[in-house]
């Protein structure tokens, strides 16, 4: 196996793949012996799907050593042609005919990506006749990995970079510092790695629960690590060989608790473990910032440097004499202007050396220099607004592109952050809204998938969370929107998962479980229930009479219509056998749909409690109402009606932000909205004490006549999430 073959396939200097036990897997993977590539098909199983391609009948036969040799061959021609500038630096044209293989691009980057496509097309010593004209949709196609919460070795970072290059991702955002540990050397501040690169517990949650203390490297049980300058230079070069730019991130002014363990004088309290925010009024802060950022710029040649800027706790600034003094000196009216000030200082340092600053969307401010880049994470609106103002923007909205969120039902998956981003949701993300004009559109540089690692303690787990969702990110970032199709992507994905697994990657396997999507039609007073499964090689069968589905049950082929109530049980079947769990859900077009719901303890509408949509597997999906403390909410049915059942569903989650059940819920009824009578109290059940997602339904049965329904909620141990109020 010659070096150029390995280089083209992204496996240079990969110790993991050179272990003897993996040799067969390497050969199998590189030669693409998967049977799915041996079939006569009229499409190509390439990810990301090319901009244009025309598949012809027939194959060009060629052995791997000839195809991937660095020696000249009349059968394979790779040409850099400046006349192809219309395709940009990363575009290419690939022609496979009976006469041989021709690959053209206007740069070496374009040739590289063409070779990655050729790699995916090659199987069984042949390549299909095809003409491909391809270029990326976005210039920024990124993945972020947090190495502070859990440390990943140099070789593990290289492995991630390899797989990014295979799927034409070109930006590796390296989150190097945070509360969990400082991960690189700074000569002027040696205590950063001496005192805060190692900690008392490996697992983030155990470490945090036990006080979050850092230890020296020689202390028994010390966990963590850092990258030497030579490590970083090696990784930067390694990435550059694969046409990947590394964007380093150093957190300012928040998320910096670890810094003050090493240098407590840089925080307002001047004590270790006293907070996570730099003292903006302290001159030493800016000396530190300048030294660190200059070190970063010496190590990383990237045009852009990320300075964080997110989730800054400003409480310490309010009572800090130095911060107050700076506010007076600079005529600041608001404490938040201090945030703008310190971000501006970072911006100046970077600009002085010809670099551009990136920050999370909290830095978006009219005073910001237009050379700075906004990374929009709390949704899309901040990014859209910034693009309209002329800022360049990278979109990474958490509800679509956070790959540390659950990717399947939380009760069956490893612990994760509390969001829910299954691969279909990642894939169906539309980065450019229709409302964005062409001028603003040009400021959207691209997208990025983020992998925060509070719940990801090792490389096997990182692989599981990253793959195959990273492939979805890659196709959204590269392929034209009109060429993208979830059905097509899902059909292509299976063979790629097999190849990743053959190469030793611990991928997530597409779920066999059934999920539902509900459309509410308030005009026709009905629900339409769509059933779906991630796997494409199964059929869905269901019952609507409460019985367990079998291979003889109705085959799902169109949305189910609900005009009153319907109990659906469904399952995925393959060759007559059930795959995964049986899906069970009651659907109601109930009396409360479309009715007014008002919180009596705060001036807020509870519209989504009566919209007919059932909450999903995350309290962040827009169908749950998230509340704190005792609450009351009142539904107005519009007129007196007979009511026999009122129910609500509540969430318990012992991971991430945590959701708690209310201690009790009381139901009350009224006809005039003033005089209420109680219909009963339901108290919290003792659910399993496990981190996984669980639910409790608070159900009230009886026979009442009323116009108004009030629910009095007695708070649990923290934040609560309530689903639809169902009235029957």
Please give the residue ranges for each predicted region.
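Bacterial Sec-dependent N-terminal signal peptides
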Residues: 1-43
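Acidic, contiguous N-terminal accessory segments
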Residues: 29, 36-141, 353-360, 364, ...
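Short, compositionally stereotyped local motifs that mark structural "simplifiers"
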Residues: 38, 480, 484-635, 642
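Feature activates predominantly on carbohydrate-active enzymes
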Residues: 45, 64, 89-287, 292-304, ...
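Surface-exposed loop/turn motifs at beta-strand-loop junctions within extracellular Ig-like
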Residues: 107, 572-576, 715
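Active-site neighborhood of glycoside hydrolase catalytic domains
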Residues: 259, 265-370, 377-380, 384-385
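Flexible, acidic glycine-rich loops studded with aromatic residues
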Residues: 357-362, 367-372, 378-527
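Aromatic, loop-rich ligand-recognition surfaces of beta-strand-rich domains
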Residues: 617-680, 692-728
